UniProtKB/Swiss-Prot annotation:
PANTHER family: PHOSPHOPENTOMUTASE. GO terms for biological process: 2-deoxyribose 1-phosphate catabolic process; 5-phosphoribose 1-diphosphate biosynthetic process; metabolic compound salvage; nucleotide metabolic process. Keywords: Cytoplasm, Isomerase, Manganese, Metal-binding. The keyword Metal-binding applies. The gene is deoB. It comes from Bacillus thuringiensis (strain Al Hakam). It comes from the Bacteria. Mn(2+) 1 binds at D13, D327, H328. Pfam families: Metalloenzyme. It catalyses: 2-deoxy-alpha-D-ribose 1-phosphate = 2-deoxy-D-ribose 5-phosphate; alpha-D-ribose 1-phosphate = D-ribose 5-phosphate. Isomerase that catalyzes the conversion of deoxy-ribose 1-phosphate (dRib-1-P) and ribose 1-phosphate (Rib-1-P) to deoxy-ribose 5-phosphate (dRib-5-P) and ribose 5-phosphate (Rib-5-P), respectively. Belongs to the phosphopentomutase family. The keyword Cytoplasm applies. It is found in: Cytoplasm. The lineage of its organism: Bacteria, Bacillati, Bacillota, Bacilli, Bacillales. This is Phosphopentomutase.
Amino acid sequence: MNKYKRIFLVVMDSVGIGEAPDAEQFGDLGSDTIGHIAEHMNGLHMPNMVKLGLGNIREMKGISKVEKPLGYYTKMQEKSTGKDTMTGHWEIMGLYIDTPFQVFPEGFPKELLDELEEKTGRKIIGNKPASGTEILDELGQEQMETGSLIVYTSADSVLQIAAHEEVVPLDELYKICKIARELTLDEKYMVGRVIARPFVGEPGNFTRTPNRHDYALKPFGRTVMNELKDSDYDVIAIGKISDIYDGEGVTESLRTKSNMDGMDKLVDTLNMDFTGLSFLNLVDFDALFGHRRDPQGYGEALQEYDARLPEVFEKLKEDDLLLITADHGNDPVHHGTDHTREYVPLLAYSPSMKEGGQELPLRQTFADIGATVAENFGVKMPEYGTSFLNELKK
C-alpha cells in the first residue's frame, strides 16, 4: 500500500539557499540566491513558503521561522560535479553525474566551430547566447544571402543551429546537427542538447517552423521515473521536465509558457485522478531573472509563485505529498551570468500531517528525493539516495 497516492514534485529552477561546502571549487563563494534577493527586496514576502518552513531552514530578510511549520524542512547538497539543470534533475531522480554539462555564456570555442565548419562546408555566424526570435531578426537575412549557419546558445547547456528551409534543406540541417551532436560528446564541449531550428519567411518577417528537432542525451542510467513508468504508475512531466530527461520515464508531458502557466498546469494535475508522480519545473526564475542578473524581477517572480500556493494547498488530498525544491542556485547579484553552487531547500507537506512538520536531517544528495518517491511506490530503489519517507509522520 503506497503511503501517498500522488506525489507532486515542484522544482523552483535555480532557487538556491546559500553557498555549498564546495562552492569555492566552482568560483561561487558567497553565493546566496534567496538570501541576496531578500536583501535586495528589503524583505521577501512569501507567507506560504514561510508557513511550510522556508524560514526554519534559514532566516532571511522577510522570511522568518515559524513555531509550527506545516511541513518538514531541510536543505540538500548536490553530490554530482556539475551545477547545471540536467545534472541537478538527473540527480534528483537517482543518478550521480561525474562529468558536468558545459554552458557557453561567451559563445562556443573557436576550435569547435572550426571543426563544424570544416565538416559541414558552411560558415558559422552568431555564436552567442540569444533569444531564437531576436537572432533571426539580426542574422536571418545574412543567413539567407550567404548560406551560413546561425549558431547560438542559451543559458542552458544547448547548441542551436538555425537556417532558412529554402537555403539549407531540412535533411541537410538535420545531418549538420548530428555532426554537431557527435562533436559535442567530447567532455570539454559536452552540451546537453543540440537543436535544429529551421525557419521560413522574408527579412523582417521570419518565423520558426514546427520542424525543430532535438538531439538530446538520454540519462545514462535508469531513473526513478523509468521504474515508475515500467510499474504502470503515471509520471506527468510539466514544463521542461520531459526535455531534461529526453522523455525517459514520462507517461504524459504538459508544456508551459511561463511560471504562472506552470502553476495553472499543476492545479490541473491536482484535479486529475492518477497514481504516481507529477513533476513540475518552474524555469522563469532561472531563465528570465537569474542569468540576466535581475534580483528585482527574481524577487517579484518568487512572490507571484508564493501567492499561487494556497490554490495548491486547497486541492491537496490527505494521501497526497507535495515536495518543493530546486536544482542549483543562480544568484542574481553574483559575478558573471552562470549558475551558482548552492544548497537547495527541501520542503515536504501533506494535509495528513496534522501535527505539522519538523526538521529533517541535512540531505547529502538530491537523490534522496528519488529514493523517497521510489520507496513510496514500491519500485526499485536508485543506487544513490536515502529515503526520508518514514520520517514523514502523519
